[in-house]
């Protein structure tokens, strides 16, 4: 008897974009282990695996106060662009900033006009008639901060928010840091430097790169070098300072920052409905 359901096959298709038969084979091969099935399909060349897994039907907005950013969710974009909801979200961001909230629990406990943010959002939810959620919060420490909020359309509130912490002086430094924030919004860097990538993530990527290389039939002696090359490509995709600059594709983000006298010390990126 199969250790998976039709719902598992459907979800795997949505996440990987692979065909039904491939999804069934992957689940059979992994004895129903969903995460391993995703890896199997990725090795076999499924496109956008991992990126689609982050998607969610959730609506809402991103709000920033000082060096704190919050995500608050609604069920529909109709509510997300409601003036009362947007005003409430900014008050929540202010309250979260006051306590330097970094967890959903700290966000929920933040004081909002004498009541917790958790109680306040329940009241607003009852009034609006739609489920609302305090999703997450982060406070980014740093000498200076650049903030970028992106709206998907003019009539909707920000759906992407980025905080970039940096050191540097003058208008050129400010402009460079802002460009870095826009880069994070667009290219979705996951780490600042390759040293920030967890060891388990590196090992997983190395393993996948090796399996792909072997399946391509490359000579055994060439495999280590090819794997390292693919790992370097991975770093250039996910590490901010190693990405090609959107402002000048001939330079890395680090080179652009160095020229402006900027040192990036951290960043955070939120997108509504994503992990």
UniProtKB/Swiss-Prot annotation:
One of the record's GO cellular component terms: cytoplasm
Classification via PANTHER family: ELONGATION FACTOR TS, ELONGATION FACTOR TS, MITOCHONDRIAL
UniProt keyword terms in alphabetical order: Cytoplasm, Elongation factor, Protein biosynthesis
Name of protein: Elongation factor Ts
Family recorded in the similarity comment: Belongs to the EF-Ts family.
Region (Involved in Mg(2+) ion dislocation from EF-Tu): 76-79
InterPro entries: EF-Ts_dimer_sf (IPR036402), Transl_elong_EFTs/EF1B (IPR001816), Transl_elong_EFTs/EF1B_dimer (IPR014039), Transl_elong_Ts_CS (IPR018101), UBA-like_sf (IPR009060)
Record organism: Corynebacterium diphtheriae (strain ATCC 700971 / NCTC 13129 / Biotype gravis)
Top-rank taxon: Bacteria
Function description: Associates with the EF-Tu.GDP complex and induces the exchange of GDP to GTP. It remains bound to the aminoacyl-tRNA.EF-Tu.GTP complex up to the GTP hydrolysis stage on the ribosome.
Cell compartment(s), UniProt: Cytoplasm
GO molecular function terms noted in the UniProt entry: translation elongation factor activity
Pfam family of the protein (one): EF_TS
Main localization category: cytoplasm
């Amino acid at each position: 008897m199969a250790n998976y359901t039709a719902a598992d096959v459907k979800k795997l298709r949505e996440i990987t974009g692979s065909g039904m038969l491939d999804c069934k084979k992957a689940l059979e091969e992994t004895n129903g282990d969903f995460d391993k099935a995703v890896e199997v399909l990725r090795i076999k060349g499924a496109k956008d695996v991992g990126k689609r897994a982050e998607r969610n039907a959730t609506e809402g907005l991103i709000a920033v106060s000082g060096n704190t950013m919050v995500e608050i969710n609604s069920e529909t974009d109709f509510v997300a662009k409601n003036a009362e909801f947007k005003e409430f979200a900014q008050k929540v961001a202010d309250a979260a900033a006051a306590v330097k909230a970094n967890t959903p629990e700290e966000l929920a406990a933040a004081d909002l006009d004498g009541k917790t943010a958790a109680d306040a959002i329940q009241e607003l939810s009852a009034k609006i008639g739609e489920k609302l959620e305090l999703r997450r919060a982060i406070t980014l420490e740093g000498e200076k901060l650049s903030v970028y909020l992106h709206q998907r359309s003019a009539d909707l509130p920000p759906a992407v928010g980025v905080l970039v912490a940096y050191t540097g002086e003058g208008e050129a430094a400010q402009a460079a840091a802002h460009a870095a924030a826009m880069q994070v919004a667009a290219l979705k860097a996951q780490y600042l430097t390759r040293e920030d990538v967890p060891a388990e993530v590196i090992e997983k990527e190395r393993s996948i790169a090796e399996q792909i290389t072997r399946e391509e039939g490359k000579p055994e002696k060439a495999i280590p070098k090819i794997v390292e090359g693919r790992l370097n490509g991975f770093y250039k995709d996910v590490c901010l300072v190693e990405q090609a600059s959107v402002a000048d594709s001939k330079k890395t983000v680090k080179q652009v920052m160095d020229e402006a006298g900027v040192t990036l010390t951290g960043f955070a990126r939120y997108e509504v409905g994503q992990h």
